[in-house]
Curated annotation (Swiss-Prot):
The gene is laf-1. GO terms for cellular component: canonical inflammasome complex; cell leading edge; cytoplasm; cytoplasmic stress granule; lamellipodium; nucleus; P granule; plasma membrane. InterPro entries: DEAD/DEAH_box_helicase_dom, Ded1/Dbp1_DEADc, Helicase_ATP-bd, Helicase_C-like, P-loop_NTPase, RNA-helicase_DEAD-box_CS, RNA_helicase_DEAD_Q_motif. Belongs to the DEAD box helicase family. DDX3/DED1 subfamily. The N-terminal domain is required for the multimeric binding of laf-1 to RNA. It is an enzyme of class 3 (hydrolase). Residues 72-83, 90-99 have a biased composition (Basic and acidic residues). The keyword Transcription regulation applies. Pfam families: DEAD, Helicase_C. It comes from Caenorhabditis elegans. Disruption phenotype: Embryonic lethal or lethal at the first larval stage of development. Embryos exhibit severe morphological defects. RNAi-mediated knockdown results in embryonic lethality in 88% of animals. Knockdown also results in disrupted P granule organization and assembly in the early embryo. Reduced survival in response to heat and oxidative stress. Double RNAi knockdown with vbh-1 results in a high number of female offspring. It is found in: Cytoplasm; Cytoplasmic granule; Nucleus; Cytoplasm, Stress granule. This is ATP-dependent RNA helicase laf-1.
Length: 708
């Protein structure tokens, strides 16, 4: 192989001092000192104009003419010295197998200023042949920035081929940010495989899904003309790329929430889905969302726009809102899984100063699916970096808490005040483990009138796959009792301990550490990198005990949690449902232990109903306390046993009447009649996970205090 010295085409003095201008050492030619910036050499570190090659990548043999800097590294220098020659021939493994600038021109009219690369050469990514035959248009690779100054004269994407590269390619899908071209707008070329990314995305545990348990879970779907549920993913008309990603992810067959949600969303229906975390609801909205964007193609993508001030505004096709950083990150990683090797890109926005610049940088690379917390999203929209005009799909995850925890004004601002298509023009989906009536009424403001309501039985209640233990523990005995439980569980199992306050989480974790337990904590006062680090230590079992506040742990899907301990019981039984759902995931067996004392009397009756419904052991003292409250009239709960507690909510539209499909909008009862009537609610009911039996059922008038 020729040395870089032989590619110089100029003297060492010329490399060090071009016309009296000092050349920094890191831009010089390495061993010979003269291979960096001589008139014929270019920057041998960057594989630039003329003969210099990227030395570690094999070099550009056969150097061309009059050099200059490939990327200029102007740093306030004059652009005039940055015009290069014709470039070398990109044989052999240039720039780590990517053939960078092989065969292209030199460092054109713009140098490194404003992150613009050289004017010459194509970026023949993954190719081993000649480089692109035409120059970049006003700029080069630009650090993966897909701005309007970076498009070449041609737009073919030579995907992992070993022949000649296409003209001027500079991004993976260089027509995403360009006006649609009839010949290249079908996204026909799938991206190359990347073993490292595959290991990152698909190595997580999915084999632990207990589908036999899932088949026992009851499902109710209400609304007019509810789409038929599916039994297999092959029942859907999915794009072949996402079908392959589903198989690669190890999904054997759809879970109950997926069987009903995916066909409803594919059919253009809005959806309110009541399903517990861990039931597969993230895939239930991501699969139809990614599939729709793929099938719509780039012609339907709202192009990004660069303002006069140089700011680039992205217009996502889909928006997913969630209440916490961790849940947003979890959804983002799942979206990457289903969009793997497709032209679809996801972006992530959540609060915290330490990640802001990185989030904005990645956002500028392109965004079809945006996953965000409401506050950070509003901040970025106020800066003119995000527009909602092209958003055709809206998802609210953990919607009950989003609407109940003070996020409602922010959600309204995002949806109603930023030119987002109206609810009649978009598809909206809401998912949560519970949907009380008041939240349903609030959610209707964002949904079309004919939305589908889906109620999936609690995984861990009706399936009896979570053993629930309620124990009486006085406040001053909690730490001692907790350590007894931890010792009994052992280090081989993951244990999640819930407390009510951030201070309580820190104090308890500190105490357990002093007692030689491997423990970490997450709460709102920790920085984001600390929270992510602690979660990783917990997931991997390095620290098998996690002490968390409920808000910080909202929606987290952590496999293999064997034991959930409610060190502090919540004041709301719905929150109790969210918490115990962290164990017994995807149909597997788990244990939930709750410390109860006089402070928790307000939830005694509802807690008893849940225990009875799940056929769990009911302590005599809890039954007696609940009976005293019921007879004394001192508590207004949600109703007695058997009134649907096995679901996290029932469609309020069909709770107001009884009989066989009575008249009036929403006044009729039952699941009979299908779409043959104007009032009432046609739908499906299944005693198992997604059967197709359509039934007619009479409903008794619910107790008055059911939704109180």
């Amino acid at each position: 192989m020729e040395s870089n010295q032989s590619n110089n085409g100029g003297s060492g003095n010329a490399a060090l001092n071009r016309g009296g201008r000092y050349v920094p050492p890191h831009l010089r030619g390495g061993d010979g000192g003269a291979a960096a910036a001589a008139s014929a050499g270019g920057d041998d570190r960057r594989g630039g104009a003329g003969g210099g090659g990227y030395r570690r990548g094999g070099g550009n043999s056969g150097g061309g003419g009059g050099g200059g800097y490939d990327r200029g590294y102007n740093d306030n220098r004059d652009d005039r010295d940055n015009r290069g020659g014709s470039g070398g021939y990109g044989r052999d493994r240039n720039y780590e197998d990517r053939g960078y600038n092989g065969g292209g021109g030199g460092g054109g009219n713009r140098g490194y200023n404003n992150n613009r690369g050289g004017g010459g050469g194509g970026y023949n990514r993954q190719d081993r042949g000649d480089g692109g035959s035409s120059n970049f248009s006003r700029g080069g690779y630009n650090n993966r920035d897909e701005g309007s100054d970076n498009r070449g004269s041609g737009r073919s994407y030579n995907n992992d081929r070993r022949d000649n590269g296409g003209d001027g390619q500079n991004t993976r899908w260089n027509n995403l940010d360009a006006p649609p071209s009839r010949g290249t707008s079908k996204w026909e070329n799938r991206g190359a495989r990347d073993e490292r990314i595959e290991q990152e995305l698909f190595s997580g545990q999915l084999s632990g899904i207990n589908f036999d348990k899932y088949e026992e879970i009851p499902v109710e779907a209400t609304g007019d003309d509810v789409p038929q549920p599916i039994s297999l993913f092959s029942d859907l008309s999915l794009h072949e790329w996402i079908e392959e990603n589903i198989k690669t992810a190890g999904y054997d067959r759809p879970t109950p929430v997926q069987k009903y949600s995916i066909p409803a969303l594919q059919g253009g229906r809005d959806l309110m889905s009541c399903a517990q975390t861990g039931s597969g609801k993230t895939a239930a909205f991501l699969v139809p969302l990614v599939n729709a964007i793929l099938q719509d193609g780039p012609d339907a993508v709202h192009r990004s726009v660069t303002s006069s001030g140089g700011r680039k505004k992205q217009y996502p096709s889909a928006l997913v809102l969630s209440p916490t950083r961790e849940l947003s990150l979890q959804i983002f990683n799942e979206s990457r899984k289903f969009a793997y090797r497709t032209p679809i890109t996801s972006a992530l926005l959540y609060g915290g100063r330490e990640n802001y610049k990185d989030q904005i940088h990645k956002l500028r690379l392109g965004c079809h699916i945006l996953i965000a917390t409401p506050g950070r999203l509003i901040d970025v929209m106020d800066q003119g970096l995000i527009g909602m005009e092209g958003c055709r799909y809206l998802v609210l995850d953990e919607a009950d808490r989003m609407l109940d925890m003070g996020f409602e004004p922010q959600i309204r601002q995002i949806v109603e005040c930023n030119r987002m298509p109206s609810k009649e023009e978009r598809i909206t989906a809401m998912f949560s483990a519970t949907f009380p009536k008041e939240i349903q009424l609030l959610a209707q403001d964002f949904l079309k009138e004919n939305y589908v309501f889906l109620a999936v039985g609690r995984v861990g209640s009706t399936s009896e796959n979570i053993m629930q233990k309620i124990v009486w523990v006085e406040e001053d005995e909690k730490r001692s009792y907790l350590m007894d439980l931890l010792d009994a569980t052992g280090d081989s199992s993951l244990t999640l301990v819930f407390v009510e306050t951030k201070r309580g989480a820190s104090d308890l974790a500190y105490y357990l550490n002093r007692q030689n337990y491997e423990v970490v904590t997450i709460h709102g006062d920790l920085k984001q990198f600390e929270r992510e680090k602690h979660l990783d230590l917990f997931r991997t079992g390095t620290a098998p005990i996690l002490v968390a506040t409920a808000v910080a742990a909202r929606g987290l899907d952590i496999p293999n949690v064997k034991h959930v301990i409610n060190y502090d019981l919540p004041s709301d039984v719905d929150e109790y449902v969210h918490r115990i759902g962290r164990t017994g995931r995807v149909g597997n067996v788990g244990l939930a232990t709750s410390f109860f004392n006089d402070k928790n009397r307000n939830i005694a009756r509802e807690l008893m109903d849940l225990i009875v419904e799940a056929n769990q052991e009911l302590p005599d003292w809890l039954e007696g306390m609940s009976g005293d409250m019921r007879s004394g009239g001192g508590y207004r709960g949600r109703g007695g046993r058997g009134n649907g507690q096995r679901f996290g909510g029932r469609d309020h539209r069909y709770q107001g009447g009884s009989g066989n499909g009575g008249g009036g909008n929403g006044g009729g009862g039952g699941f009979g009649g299908g779409g043959q009537r104007s009032g009432g609610g046609g739908g499906f009911q299944s005693g198992g996970g997604g059967g197709r039996q359509q039934q007619q059922q009479q409903r008794a008038q619910p107790q008055q205090d059911w939704w109180s």
